[in-house]
From Swiss-Prot:
EC number: 1.-.-.-
InterPro entries: BBE, FAD-bd_PCMH, FAD-bd_PCMH-like_sf, FAD-bd_PCMH_sub2, FAD-linked_Oxidoreductases_BP, Oxid_FAD_bind_N
Domain FAD-binding PCMH-type: 119-301
Cofactor: FAD
Key words of the record: FAD, Flavoprotein, Glycoprotein, Oxidoreductase, Signal
Encoding gene (name): ffsJ
Glycosylation sites: N30, N53, N72, N114, N314, N329, N461, N465, N478, N514
Protein name listed in UniProt: FAD-linked oxidoreductase ffsJ
The keyword Oxidoreductase belongs to this UniProt entry's keyword annotation: yes
Top-level taxonomy: Eukaryota, Fungi, Dikarya, Ascomycota, Pezizomycotina
Signal sequence extent: 1-19
Length: 614
């Protein structure tokens, strides 16, 4: 009786199309899982007196605690029903389909007074995955009942792929083991890949950077402290500050442990299940299986040079535009010196593991002169390790979360940076973005110098020097960047555009918790227009699926280029029943798919947020 009372409310909350699984089905699954199946309720529910249009008793103490932590990323990733970007919790086109506080002021009573807290796009139930058998049970349940499965690692997906109304959520954050290998040989392989770390699927960058530092090595990862290192980041590409010299996440991962949709517990690497390994190295999350752990090569801990460039807050628009011009002009020269990081018209932070302090100062001299001449701050310093950069610069710059954010990105080919005419076209596009209220940024995080078996480029053979370059080749100072045999033209499946690019252009839009439908549509249309314009500027390039908006046209080509056909074939091989599906993921074409990540679509029909916002 106790189990029935616990599960029934969530069953009753599901729309008809997601009630194919009976109460008996859910109870049977709960028994299989040793009573570890739990209902999902909205994070902010304790603040509301109405839930799904029925009376509900608020909990003031619980509400105050939620309000205190509502915009904290570390708090959110550890909450079952919280996502870093709140579009994953809502059906954006329908204001009533949400249970949100005001992220600008979580104590604002206007968000929850006399308003119904509705389930939105949250899953129905979740499992805290502890063993491979948990995932096997979930896949068997999904095959029997036609229930959608969503996979939640840290919940950072801009497209809401890790949520889904009525779905069964597999939460992997609880898998947090860490192992350091002085020398690692993948299963069934004969050749070791060198120093490596094996990470449970739930380990995030803050945790792995700390662990790596304790073992005097460097993990090459992303900039979001709470992003999972084994989730969508590495499965889709995975870029970061050190990618210039050491490659993307997909270049560095040497083995995955996962459960495939047939329920089998597998190891995938270059020596066994090699086609699956290829698909996992860029084919996207929530597509080919549920990752339990991943193993990545690491670098020795070593000093790096950091450049900090910031204009004063009162900088004129013309000064900001000139600074953005400088970033465009120096993207290629800085890429030659392995400078990696992020820049926009206000500030830039870059780091390189290849230059000494005097060399770094020479490389950055023009930029430092510019910002200091305009009343800003510019300097270069040596840090003892990437971990010092992470703790000193990345952690303090982490922004508040819990609001709606949609991203646009396009990988800009070297050819646009290499000529004066290309730079002019790009700057004209950046000016247009500013004129419509977007804040363009450049991610200097492509694998520009990474070299391996025919892809990327060695810094002993750079042929794209811009006429604006004042730096010398890193090869004369540091030798060539270490080539890795695990690289190679055919070994990863993300968009090939990564291999011929020096930067990624990004922008984002967001809206308030109480934004009207017309306001949402206007912002979304602006973002879409920006992506269409830059695609015309750089046709044949691609986008990073993790940081793309949900309205990308011809997304198969944009996200995977010529790799898509093989990925689609492998999707049919490894998931013939289509038990895993998500928005704009491999194999998601067609109607009637069990997709996650539909939270921004236009109307709720049969339990799904369907149609188009724009």
């Amino acid at each position: 009786m106790r189990l029935t009372r616990a599960l029934t409310p969530a069953i009753l909350a599901l729309p008809a199309a997601h009630a194919a699984a009976s109460l008996q089905d859910w109870q049977s699954l709960n028994t299989t899982l040793d009573h570890r199946l739990h209902a999902v309720t909205p994070l902010a529910l304790p603040c509301f007196s109405i839930y799904n249009n029925h009376s509900h008793a608020p909990n003031e103490d619980a509400c105050l605690n939620i309000q205190d932590h509502y915009t904290n990323a570390s708090y959110r990733v550890d909450q079952v029903s919280a996502y870093v970007f709140s579009q994953s919790e809502t059906c954006s086109p329908i204001p009533s389909q949400q249970c949100e506080l005001d992220p600008s002021d979580p104590s604002n009573p206007a968000a929850y007074t006399n308003i119904s807290c509705n389930t939105g796009s949250l899953p129905a139930y979740y499992i805290d995955v502890q063993h491979a058998s948990d995932v096997t049970a979930a896949f068997h349940f999904a095959a029997k009942t036609n229930t959608a499965i969503s996979i939640k690692n840290s919940g950072h997906d801009y497209n809401g792929r890790s949520s889904g109304p009525g779905s069964l959520s597999l939460r992997t954050r609880t898998l947090r083991s860490t192992t350091y290998h002085p020398s690692f040989t993948p299963a069934s392989c004969k050749t070791p890949t060198g120093k490596a770390v094996t990470l449970g699927a739930g380990v995030n960058f803050h945790e792995v950077y700390t662990f790596a530092h304790e073992n005097k090595v460097t993990f090459v990862g992303g900039s979001g402290p709470t992003v999972g290192a084994s989730g969508g980041w590495v499965l889709t590409g995975g870029h970061g500050v050190l990618s210039r010299a050491y490659g993307l996440g997909i270049d560095r991962v040497v083995e995955f442990e996962l459960v495939t949709p047939d329920g089998e517990h597998r190891i995938a690497n270059a020596c066994q299940n090699a086609d699956l390994f290829w698909a996992l190295r860029g084919g996207g999350g929530s597509t080919f299986g549920v990752v339990l752990s991943s193993t990545h090569r690491v670098e020795p801990e070593a000093p790096l040079s950091l450049a900090y460039l910031a204009l004063p807050p009162n900088a004129s628009s013309s000064t900001s535009a000139a600074f953005l011009d400088l970033l465009v002009n120096y993207t290629l020269p800085w890429a030659e010196d392995a400078w990696g990081g992020f820049g926009n018209a206000a500030a830039t932070i870059l780091a390189t593991p290849l230059l000494s302090l005097p060399e770094a100062k020479t490389s950055m001299a023009t930029a430092i002169d510019f910002v200091t001449a305009h009343g800003g701050t510019g300097y270069v310093e040596t840090l003892s390790s990437f971990y010092e950069m992470y703790t000193k610069y990345i952690v303090p710059s982490a922004s508040a979360v819990g609001s709606v954010r949609f991203n646009h990105n396009w990988i800009i080919p070297n050819s646009l940076f290499a000529t004066a005419s290309g730079q002019k076209k790009l700057r004209k596009h950046l000016d247009w973005m500013g004129s419509v209220g977007l804040v363009p940024g450049l991610l200097e995080t492509t694998p520009y110098l990474y070299s391996g078996n025919g892809h990327g480029r060695s810094n002993n053979n750079n042929s794209n020097n811009s006429s604006t370059s004042t730096s010398t080749s890193t090869s004369s100072k540091n030798g060539s960047v270490k080539p890795y045999a695990y690289g190679g033209k055919e070994t990863t499946s993300s968009t090939p555009a990564w291999r011929n690019s020096a930067a990624v252009l990004i922008a984002e839009v967001g809206w308030a918790f109480n934004a009207t439908l017309s306001e949402k549509k206007a912002l979304a249309k602006t973002l879409v227009e920006a992506s269409e314009r830059v695609r015309e500027l750089a046709p044949g390039s691609g986008a990073y699926a993790n940081e793309a908006h949900p309205w990308v046209e011809d997304w198969q080509d944009a996200f995977w280029g010529g790799n898509y056909r093989r990925l689609a074939d492998l999707k049919k091989k490894w998931d013939p029943k289509g038990l895993l599906g998500c928005w704009h993921c491999v194999g998601s074409e067609g109607e009637g798919k069990k997709e996650t990540g539909t939270a921004w679509r236009a109307e709720v029909v049969g339990g799904k947020c369907l149609g188009r916002l724009i």
